[in-house]
């Protein structure tokens, strides 16, 4: 039996075109916070990988956590250009129910900020 290795030790650069949003993300971010996230990524770069599930059948990555960071890459031309369209991704191999629970846990762990 292989020892457990956390996904963060296996970050990969994946073309954003191979990444798809999930259809269950419950988290919403207001436009001012999205602008701040874009600025943060512009100033500091991507400091956390996007958590994805790899769908072998369709050869694509489905976002589990990091939807808004993914969205910034899709909507900010300057970031897309600088990053050459590549996103840092870690993969978790879980079924849909477990992925949904992971998404909720990640969102709740960050909490809300005022």
Model-derived regions, located:
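General secondary-structure edge motif
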Residues: 14-21, 53
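Amphipathic, charge-rich alpha-helical segments that serve as recognition/docking helices
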Residues: 7, 20-48, 70-114
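A short acidic-Thr-Gly-centered motif at the start of a beta-strand
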Residues: 48-57
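Short, conserved phosphate/pyrophosphate- and ester-handling motifs at nucleotide-, phospho-/glycolipid
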Residues: 66
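Short active-site oxyanion
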Residues: 58-62
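N-terminal leader/domain-start detector
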Residues: 1-16
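Noncatalytic linker/hinge segments flanking ATPase motor cores
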Residues: 3-5, 34, 54-55
